[in-house]
């Protein structure tokens, strides 16, 4: 083939060959000697070289330091490279720290600092507020989330636990049960488990320890402790007040079906005894005689009213769950205060965002707690005052987060969980409160609905409907 080429062709081939060799030499001079790098990695040599690269118009200074064992034994080694570029077009500094590329699975850390755009330092929380402004914002936001639900309670048309408000109160109790159970299992417990979750960027194939199961187990134990604490306190208070299990006495309806005899039902209700009827008749006759004489119709000893001791004991029992729920609400507000205080340490915008988030979930939470207090025997004003007292817990949590500078209380911005036991213990207390049948059910209808003896007209209607009402003394 060489014979077929003319002189011009041979000259062109020669020029191309020299050009290729020149490119190889330039590449060797501009990017380092690959052979020397390999020898350095294999044998642990260290060297320094400095050169000028006229193709790019900037200088490079490379420093390599290696201390490692032979790669054939699987030992790890590290490389530190420092590069200083003076370039007309770039003008920035790069600092690279990485492990050897010859061992797969090793991590790489790169830090780039561009002049004028920031400073490298330890990661922390940026504070854009001075101390006085920080406290003013944090405490003001805490007062807002505590006062807003208080004013919402004025719009609820429930004055007390009376038959007139029974239907609406039952709806509010159902709302409270769903809200508190959802808050316990979907907010408090997952938030307590979040710091112990695995990092999402963990590489598969690397060994990992199960030491993280200890904190997760402690969260479960604190939830169980909250449930047990509620049950123990509830039983203790009932025992002290003498509220043992008892029948609520007079006026409960009992339905009996007599299979085979009659398809109708017999309802046994308590009616006034003969002695009571005779005493009432005597009182009426004495009153009539006094009226004829122009005297007072009021009996000497005053009207005799039956004492419903069963209902009073029932009311005492119902208040236990209400006050225990109030204690759980106090602890819950403490964690809300921790979150607000820690978030404002991270900046004004983050604090405002966290305040709005807490406010949106706090309003329905407080409405549910209000319904439980009313159901437990409190009037509307008493329930509102007790709800307002729980704001002390939120203020205390905010102050704790600010005084500890985030610390353990608010190390996670917008989610400061405080001491590790607060969230799971509160969640267990709330779950136990709603699991108690006395917290989600209204007291039985008063006995006055069953005491009156049906008249002749009502008896006729009852006979037509097949229901027999029998009076028992």
Curated annotation (Swiss-Prot):
Highest taxon of the lineage: Eukaryota
GO MF annotation list: zinc ion transmembrane transporter activity
Recorded catalytic activity of this chain's protein: Zn(2+)(in) = Zn(2+)(out)
GO biological process, one term: skin epidermis development
Bias (Polar residues) ranges: 431-442, 463-473
Compartments it resides in: Endoplasmic reticulum membrane; Golgi apparatus, cis-Golgi network membrane
Biased composition (Basic and acidic residues): 44-56, 66-114, 298-316, 452-462
InterPro entries xref list: ZIP
Annotated region described as Disordered, given as residue ranges: 44-120, 243-316, 428-473
Ranges annotated as spanning the membrane: 11-31, 138-158, 169-189, 214-234, 388-408
Phosphoserine PTM sites in chain numbering: 278-279
Modified residues (Pros-methylhistidine): 66
Subunit structure: Homodimer.
Function: Transports Zn(2+) from the endoplasmic reticulum (ER)/Golgi apparatus to the cytosol, playing an essential role in the regulation of cytosolic zinc levels. Acts as a gatekeeper of zinc release from intracellular stores, requiring post-translational activation by phosphorylation on residues, resulting in activation of multiple downstream pathways leading to cell growth and proliferation. Has an essential role in B cell development and is required for proper B cell receptor signaling.
Protein name: Zinc transporter SLC39A7
Gene name, Swiss-Prot/TrEMBL: SLC39A7
């Amino acid at each position: 083939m060489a014979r077929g080429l003319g002189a011009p062709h041979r000259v062109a081939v020669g020029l191309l060959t020299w050009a290729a060799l020149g490119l190889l030499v330039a590449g060797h001079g501009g990017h380092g000697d690959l052979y020397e790098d390999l020898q350095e990695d294999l044998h642990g040599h260290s060297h320094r070289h400095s050169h000028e690269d006229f193709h790019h118009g900037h200088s490079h200074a490379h420093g390599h330091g290696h201390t490692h064992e032979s790669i054939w034994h699987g030992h790890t080694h590290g490389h530190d490279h420092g590069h200083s570029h003076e370039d007309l077009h770039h003008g920035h500094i790069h600092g690279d720290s990485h492990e050897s590329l010859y061992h797969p699975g090793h991590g790489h850390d790169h830090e780039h600092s561009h002049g004028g755009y920031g400073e490298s330092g330890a990661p922390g929380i940026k504070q854009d507020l001075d101390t006085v402004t920080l406290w003013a914002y944090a405490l003001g936001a805490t007062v807002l989330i505590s006062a807003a639900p208080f004013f919402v309670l004025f719009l609820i048309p429930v004055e007390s636990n009376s038959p007139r408000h029974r239907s609406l109160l039952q709806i509010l109790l159902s709302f409270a049960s769903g809200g508190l159970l959802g808050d316990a299992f979907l907010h408090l417990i997952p938030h307590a488990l979040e710091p112990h979750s695995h990092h999402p960027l963990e590489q598969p194939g690397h060994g990992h320890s199960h030491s993280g199961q200890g904190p997760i187990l402690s969260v479960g134990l604190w939830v169980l402790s909250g449930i047990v604490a509620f049950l123990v306190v509830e039983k203790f208070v009932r025992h002290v007040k003498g509220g043992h299990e008892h029948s609520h006495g007079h006026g409960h309806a009992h339905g009996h079906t007599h299979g085979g005899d009659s398809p109708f039902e017999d309802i046994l209700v308590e009616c006034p005894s003969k002695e009571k009827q005779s005493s009432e008749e005597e009182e009426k006759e004495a009153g009539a005689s006094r009226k004829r004489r122009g005297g007072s119709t009021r009996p000497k000893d005053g009207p005799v009213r039956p004492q419903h001791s069963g209902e009073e004991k029932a009311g005492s029992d119902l208040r236990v769950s209400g006050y225990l729920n109030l204690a759980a609400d106090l602890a819950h507000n403490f964690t809300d205060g921790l979150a607000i205080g820690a978030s404002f340490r991270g900046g004004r915008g983050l604090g405002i965002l966290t305040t709005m988030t807490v406010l949106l979930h706090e309003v329905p939470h407080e409405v549910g707690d209000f319904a439980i207090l009313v159901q437990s025997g409190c009037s509307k004003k008493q329930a509102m005052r007790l709800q307002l007292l729980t704001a002390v817990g939120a203020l205390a949590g905010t102050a704790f987060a600010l005084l500890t500078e985030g610390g353990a209380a608010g190390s996670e911005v917008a989610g400061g969980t405080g001491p590790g036991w607060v969230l799971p213990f509160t969640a267990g207390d709330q779950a136990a409160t709603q699991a108690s049948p006395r917290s989600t059910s209204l007291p039985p209808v008063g006995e006055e609905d069953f005491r009156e003896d049906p008249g002749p007209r009502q008896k006729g209607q009852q006979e037509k409907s097949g229901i027999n009402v029998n009076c028992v003394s």
